[in-house]
UniProtKB/Swiss-Prot annotation:
One of its GO terms (molecular function) is electron transporter, transferring electrons within the cyclic electron transport pathway of photosynthesis activity. Pfam families: DUF2382, PRC. Residues 253-274 are annotated as: Disordered. This is Uncharacterized protein DR_1314. GO terms for biological process: photosynthesis, light reaction. Transmembrane segments: none annotated. One of its GO terms (cellular component) is plasma membrane light-harvesting complex.
Amino acid sequence: MTQASLIRLSELNNDAQYNLNDTSMYNPVGAAAYGVNGDKIGTVRDALVEPETGRIRYFLVDVGGWFSSKEVLVPVGYGRVDDSGVYFDSLTKDQVKDMSEYRADQAYSSEMMDTDERVLRGNQSQEEYHQRAYQTPDRLQLLEERLVVNKDRFKAGSVQIGKRIETRQETVSVPLQREEVVIERHAVTDGRAVEGAVLGEGHQTMSVDLEAERANISKQAYVTEEVSVGKRAVTETQQVTETVGREVLDVNQTGDVRTTEGTALTDDTTKRNI
């Protein structure tokens, strides 16, 4: 497997798909690295992993304890994970000296990989080397994807508030006064005679002016309501659904093997997921 098909473990965290800060996840970055006889050789700076599964394939080790300014890639099967660091029990100073120097700005080429294999393999067969080199250490925790949801603000809309005129018919009762003529007639009972008067002569006419009130209509604007506009934040819960993955161990047991529960497995090959 070439580096082209592997990515750095730190890049998984940058993609926010894997939570490397979770205590249930194993993150070797920053762990102390020890070589043969428990000699401290430096620090694990990073790891190369399969992007699809997150499985570690190489530890990127800064071997400053043996050689200044040199980083090498050590297959995961050569590491033994402990609370105090990662132990490469069979890794010697001479091997590290002959291994290819890894630089972040260059690919881990097939030539470099072959060189490191020859150095680490020694007298082992190629099959034995590959079986060991990429075998998961006894304690290597698995990565699990978890949803990381961020929030950003955007303009959801706008509200425009103005005024318009609406009309309605309004009826008001107004009391109005007017004058009317009152004619009073009184009968004369003493029958006085009018001397020299001839009927029809001296015709007289009386004129009376009448007054009346009329309604004068006008309109006046009054303040009936005041409107103030502001904003307030309301919180609503939105459910987000996405597919996430996690690593599971494929345990292959061959022959007469006992599990931690003490159950004997006698089938030739038994495979189960944990």
